[in-house]
Amino acid sequence: MMLRVLVGAVLPAMLLAAPPPINKLALFPDKSAWCEAKNITQIVGHSGCEAKSIQNRACLGQCFSYSVPNTFPQSTESLVHCDSCMPAQSMWEIVTLECPGHEEVPRVDKLVEKILHCSCQACGKEPSHEGLSVYVQGEDGPGSQPGTHPHPHPHPHPGGQTPEPEDPPGAPHTEEEGAED
């Protein structure tokens, strides 16, 4: 009975899991997939604020994809595969931008994804933030406490959760009187 439950729960998960990346193709035995993190200078900006240049990495490479012609009626599964060079490990860093001339909003915090490692992964795969080493680094540098920030503001920091890439928090905040810098 327990074996049926285990097979019933694990087998569908294994079938739905993305296939492993392909490093070689039989048609091109002399070519290999490659994917690496390249150093870049990224400019972080916000309307009405001074932009900052930071060091980051971008994923660059050539991963395999292929599509074998189908038949109708279909006699076998469609043979389509797609890998893309994308972040395999990243962390989030707070970048504070100064907004001179804006008394109500003197600073804006931006969360920036810092790429640590890249690899060939399934194209349709959503960026997985589960199991990633998430550490928010503030202005005080690596010695500062994860999830803390030297300026008080209304938006929460991602203590153990990573914000969704589509909508990272970057809302402006108001400096309180008497707050320490």
From Swiss-Prot:
Residues 132-181 are annotated as: Disordered. GO terms for cellular component: extracellular space. Transmembrane segments: none annotated. It is found in: Secreted. InterPro entries: Cys_knot_C, Cystine-knot_cytokine, DAN, Neuroblast_suppress_tumour_1. The keyword Acetylation does not apply. Residues 1-16 form the signal peptide. Most abundant in normal lung and meningioma. Residues 35-124 form the CTCK domain. Gene3D superfamilies: Cystine-knot cytokines. GO terms for biological process: determination of dorsal identity; negative regulation of BMP signaling pathway; negative regulation of monocyte chemotaxis; nervous system development; neuron projection morphogenesis; positive regulation of neuron differentiation; sequestering of BMP from receptor via BMP binding; sequestering of BMP in extracellular matrix. One of its GO terms (molecular function) is identical protein binding. It holds the Pfam family DAN. Disulfide bonds join 35-85, 49-99, 59-118, 63-120, 82-123. Keywords: Disulfide bond, Secreted, Signal, Tumor suppressor. Homodimer. Belongs to the DAN family. PANTHER family: GREMLIN 1, NEUROBLASTOMA SUPPRESSOR OF TUMORIGENICITY 1. Possible candidate as a tumor suppressor gene of neuroblastoma. May play an important role in preventing cells from entering the final stage (G1/S) of the transformation process. This is Neuroblastoma suppressor of tumorigenicity 1. It comes from Homo sapiens.
